[in-house]
Amino acid sequence: MDVTNILLKPVLTEKSYLNQMGELKKYVFAINPKATKTKVKLAFEIIYGVKPLKINTLIRKPVTIRNGTKYPGFSKLAKLAVITLPKGMDIAITGEKTTKKETKDQ
């Protein structure tokens, strides 16, 4: 599987923005349903140049959607990865430059 086919796109919602404001930055990405945590970690390191602290994955299963006709529709299957970065690290998703904040170790 190619690196560009693992991380499909960032998921930008209100909840994902709130996770980015904390001390440990958490970013949510839509990923290939066949991707594993190790492949996601390698792809993230290659693309963004930052080693993630933790990766959680979840599968959003298809649900029935009413569309006003006799036959119901279904939403798409989606696999998401919540990637936690180490303290003081940050990445740019929306086109901003990546910054590394220096922290004082005590």
Curated annotation (Swiss-Prot):
Signal peptide interval: none
Which GO terms fall under molecular function for this chain's record? rRNA binding; structural constituent of ribosome
Output the Pfam families linked to this UniProt entry. Answer: Ribosomal_L23 (PF00276)
Instruction: State if RNA-binding is listed as a keyword.
Output: yes
Keyword terms? Ribonucleoprotein, Ribosomal protein, RNA-binding, rRNA-binding
Q: Name one GO cellular component term.
A: ribonucleoprotein complex
Record-level GO BP terms:
translation
Q: Does the keyword RNA-binding apply?
A: yes
Q: Which domain of life is it from?
A: Bacteria
Q: From the UniProt record, list the coiled-coil ranges.
A: none
Family listed: Belongs to the universal ribosomal protein uL23 family.
Q: What does this protein do, in the record's words?
A: One of the early assembly proteins it binds 23S rRNA. One of the proteins that surrounds the polypeptide exit tunnel on the outside of the ribosome. Forms the main docking site for trigger factor binding to the ribosome.
NCBIfam families in alphabetical order: PRK05738.3-3 (NF004367)
**Assembly and interaction partners:** Part of the 50S ribosomal subunit. Contacts protein L29, and trigger factor when it is bound to the ribosome.
Protein name as catalogued: Large ribosomal subunit protein uL23
